[in-house]
Amino acid sequence: MKKRISSVGNVVTAFYQMHKKSIFYFICAVLFCLVNQAAAADLKLSFNARYKQNAALLYGEILPGDTQRVARFFIKYPDVQFLILDSRGGDVIEAIRIGELVRALRISTEVADRGMCASSCFFIWMNGAYRLAVAENYRGGSGPVGLHRPFLVNPTNSEGSLQLQSKVMIEVRNYLESNLIPRRLIDIMLTRPSNDIYWLTSDDIEELSPTSPALEELYIGKCQANTRQLLVQLEQANLKKDMQEKSRVEIQLRKMFDCTNGLDLEANAAAIKKLVSGWLPPLPFKEIRKKGD
């Protein structure tokens, strides 16, 4: 039996599908999931036929040096505004670097339909301007993400290795908290062993919201964005079959999305210009070697 996603989430998805050529809205959220790394392939980027325009698919294992590869891809294809994710994870630090790049580019992220954003892939997903995923076992539109704690690759039986594992978890916690990921979910992630997985529920996804709090406040300040209220109004209009009210709300949503999309395109152009000059986003904390996921 399929798990339910929120009714507001259904409304957002339906509205997005209606207007996907002119707006860029995603809903739901995720954290780490564990999969068999032996089956992973090197990270690849390609255009995604599902959206036909302005979308790229990132898939495979995340390895050291991939941030530069991703940056070169976006320099070559600056019109990409959607990043579809289907990755089994990989190097945590590299994933965070790519995530910071995604944040600077102000592009949207989505877990691929019948795919997954596993393990360290979460750091890429969470930095999307708008982000979409679904709860486990829900089939339709996007894929799920789960969570577990990050861990060292090939740890040694030494006090130094144990201290390094602790430092990895502390740095990850600080990073997630600085991005206002709910502490409840951070606690779940850090207490979940790396050989187990917690799949986010619809309630977890609802709690995370489709946009980071900082970016949501920018949209409110610049575009008077009242997304949540409008989506509730749209849902109510659909339930009442009030076509006049539905049309009114959809017009407001389109205007709002046009405004927020304009802000995102402006930020994207500025980031591309910096990338061309050789800039890459700095790592948000001191690098820790020998970590992975």
Language-model regions, residue ranges each:
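Short, solvent-exposed linear patches
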Residues: M116-S120
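Histidine-centered active-site/metal-ligand motif
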Residues: G146-H148
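Amphipathic, non-transmembrane alpha-helical segments in extracytoplasmic/periplasmic proteins
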Residues: F122-Y130
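Bacterial N-terminal signal peptides that target proteins for export
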Residues: K2-F26
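N-terminal organellar transit peptides
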Residues: A40-G115, Y130-G141, F151-D293
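Bacterial N-terminal signal peptides
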Residues: Y25-L34
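Sec/Tat signal peptide C-region and signal peptidase I cleavage site
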Residues: L34-A40
